Design a protein with these regions (language model features):
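Conserved small-residue
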Residues: 1-106
Length: 106
């Protein structure tokens, strides 16, 4: 399958959309018809996409109850929130600003 429980997200300065899964469920956990992979990631949807896109998680942004993501256009840093009562604010520093799939540091 693709992604589940996509909550909020955010537009990037380069025009793509970040979508956030707000459920870190995985195989062995019941969700609909069952799961075959881990969830709880952020995904980037390319601005130029004209059809379905193969979902590839931005693993370096962590796996948790993601709520939203916002990119600072001056630094390229991504600020992430969680959808939990005891949540925190995260900052992701990309290895290459504007190329989130290249990894970075949370």
């Amino acid at each position: 399958g693709g992604t589940i429980r996509n909550c909020s997200g955010g537009i990037t300065p380069w025009g793509s959309w970040l979508t956030c899964e707000e459920s870190p469920t995985g195989p062995g956990q019941k969700y609909g018809d069952g799961l075959n992979k881990n969830h709880g990631w952020v995904f980037e949807v390319p601005a130029a996409a004209t059809g379905l896109v193969d979902p590839k998680p931005l693993v370096a942004m962590g796996r948790f109850n993601h709520e939203a993501a916002c990119v600072d256009p001056a630094t390229g840093f991504v600020y992430l929130t969680e959808d939990r009562n005891d949540s925190v604010l995260y900052r992701f520093i990309p290895r290459v600003p504007g190329e989130l799939s290249q990894g970075g540091r949370l």
